[in-house]
Amino acid sequence: MVKNSEHLPWYLGSDSATAASTATDATSADGAASETDAASATDTTSATDPTSATDPIATTNTTGITSSGPTTNGRRGRPYISTPPNRCYDCGRTRSPYWRKGTYNGQVVHLCNACGLNHIKIAKKSSAIFL
């Protein structure tokens, strides 16, 4: 059974539909398509191959950040790095959905989301003691 190109999923749609339309355009005067055109119209391996260069999922950057390096944020040359830190200061994690900043011994450090929330909770409790 041949599927209609209009009902194909988004990840199979454009390449196979384009190949099918070029195969019908390349028919001869008597209405018969050559065997190579028919074979190229039914070949969908390039559209489903996960390592294909046209696959948007395979070519997505894992971090999603396209930075060429440190820039200044307008405060007289202070460097602003738009990439996340390499490690959490507390637990050593390298991946986190959100990076937070905390202070230890007067020094600003990078924390993963979980450690950052814990740091905020402890800071609130310690400041309530001194009130």
Curated annotation (Swiss-Prot):
Region Disordered: start-end pairs: 21-85
One MF term in the entry's GO annotations: sequence-specific DNA binding
SMART domains: ZnF_GATA
Biased composition (Low complexity): 21-55
Residue stretches of biased makeup (Polar residues): 57-74
Protein keywords: Metal-binding, Zinc, Zinc-finger
UniProt zinc finger (GATA-type) residues: 88-115
Domain of life per record: Eukaryota
Annotated GO biological process: aggregation involved in sorocarp development; culmination involved in sorocarp development; regulation of DNA-templated transcription; sorocarp development
Full protein name: GATA zinc finger domain-containing protein 2
Organism: Dictyostelium discoideum (Social amoeba)
Source lineage: Eukaryota, Amoebozoa, Evosea, Eumycetozoa, Dictyostelia
Gene from which this protein is expressed: comH
